[in-house]
């Protein structure tokens, strides 16, 4: 692909992803607030919130199949069109079953967008700029988690125009997606796709995918239960909620410098391996300090900052690594596995940590965190030393 076309493609992917995600993260809390205003139970609202993630998890293994059948450019168009259409559906109907179906479809499209955008950014970045571009992309995605809800608050969640603003952002994402230039044909059109392709990718890079799991566990999963952790420490509700911001700040600050540093190694593969080992070790050290937090509660802030930064950095380095090794449909398969392992790590952290915070906050909870961090560090260290990546 010519340099100018690659630059246009990268800019269009960044812009379309940014607008689509801002719209999505405005829309989800808006829908939940409307459901509560309609006296729909909290349990049903929670199930609705989980439906989007279910769509991501269920559809992600088939992203490579869509890319192979439609082409990567058309797959990105589809990933932008479905959320835009779904957002209009939320405007014109209040039927709860329809809302669930639309949210499932929007989640599936988000999974396709997640996989395709990251794979294309990795493949079409120049080798000396791949880490920077991936780090910048991950940082941009992280800002949408904050910007979407903040814009909703500014516009007013009870304003009738709020739905239309969500739709406008998503339509803007679709418009930018249409500006993505034609992409070269995948270098591996006969690559395995679907579940078989995902399984092969997992077998090819098991330790990289473990890094994705640990990244999801500490960046996204633990973050989701930090308010409960703060309350267990005796913090008030406001300070407990701010722990989430500390984790998000760590993630936002660290991903771009991590990507830029990964570009500077003469031996890129060895450099990435070494950085993963260091980041995993920092995560382990932070978890070992957790038992000291109860009597010294201010330690919680730097610890959760490190968890967010380390988790985001592990995911970023894993994406840079597979983007440096693979292309085409094979890269889409590997990206799909990385997304799945990251999501699985997040789900495992949320479920297990919530239980342990209730039954054993001073022993079981830190022990679980230390065990996950230790397994990740040992696996990455052994893989680096044996050059098994």
Task: Identify the role of each PLM range.
Residues 5-53, 207-211, 220-229, 233, ...:
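Helix-loop boundary and gating motifs at the non-cytosolic
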Residues 50-63, 245-257:
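Central cavity-lining transmembrane alpha-helices of secondary-active solute carriers
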Residues 59-71, 156, 254-270, 357:
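Helix-to-loop junctions at the C-terminal end of transmembrane segments
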Residues 75-88, 273-288, 370:
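Structural signature of the two symmetry-related core transmembrane helices
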Residues 104-139:
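Cytoplasmic helix-loop-helix junction between adjacent transmembrane helices
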Residues 112-125, 312-326:
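Intracellular juxtamembrane helix-capping segments at the cytosolic ends
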Residues 167-188, 379-383:
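C-terminal membrane-cytosol helix-exit motif in multi-pass small-molecule transporters
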Residues 329-357:
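A late C-terminal transmembrane helix in Major Facilitator Superfamily
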């Amino acid at each position: 692909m010519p340099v100018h076309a690659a630059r246009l493609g990268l800019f269009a992917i960044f812009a379309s992803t940014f607008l689509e995600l801002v719209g999505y993260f405005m829309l989800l809390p808006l829908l939940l607030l409307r459901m509560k205003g309609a006296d729909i139970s909290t349990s049903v609202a929670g199930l609705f919130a989980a439906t989007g993630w279910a769509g991501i998890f269920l559809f992600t293994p088939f992203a490579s199949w869509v890319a192979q059948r439609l082409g990567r450019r058309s797959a990105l168009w589809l990933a932008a069109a479905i959320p835009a259409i779904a957002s209009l559906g939320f405007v014109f109907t209040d039927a709860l079953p329809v809302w669930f179906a639309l949210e499932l479809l929007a989640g599936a499209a988000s999974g396709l967008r997640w996989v395709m955008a990251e794979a294309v950014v990795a493949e079409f970045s120049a080798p000396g700029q791949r880490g920077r571009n991936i780090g910048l992309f991950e940082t941009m995605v992280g800002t949408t988690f904050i910007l979407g809800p903040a814009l909703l608050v500014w516009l007013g969640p009870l304003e009738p125009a709020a739905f239309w603003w969500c739709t406008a952002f998503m339509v803007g994402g679709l418009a930018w997606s249409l500006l993505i230039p034609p992409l070269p044909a995948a270098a591996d059109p006969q690559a395995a796709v679907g579940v078989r392709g995902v399984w092969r990718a997992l077998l090819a890079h098991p330790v990289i995918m473990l890094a994705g799991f640990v990244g999801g566990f500490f960046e996204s999963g633990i973050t989701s239960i930090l308010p409960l952790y703060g309350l267990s420490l005796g913090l008030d509700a406001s300070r407990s909620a701010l722990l989430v911001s500390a984790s998000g700040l760590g993630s936002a600050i660290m991903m771009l410098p991590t990507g830029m540093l990964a570009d500077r190694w003469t031996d890129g593969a060895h450099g990435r391996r070494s950085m993963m080992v260091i980041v995993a070790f920092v995560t382990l050290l932070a978890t070992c300090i957790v038992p000291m937090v109860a009597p010294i509660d201010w330690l919680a802030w730097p610890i959760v900052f490190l968890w967010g930064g380390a988790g985001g950095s592990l995911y970023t380095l894993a994406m840079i690594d597979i983007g440096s090794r693979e292309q085409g449909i094979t890269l889409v398969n590997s990206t799909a596995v990385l997304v799945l392992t990251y999501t699985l790590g997040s789900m495992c952290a949320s479920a297990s940590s919530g239980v342990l915070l209730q039954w054993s906050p001073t022993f079981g909870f830190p022990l679980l965190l230390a065990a996950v961090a230790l397994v990740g560090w040992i696996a990455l260290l052994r893989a680096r030393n044996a050059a098994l990546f």
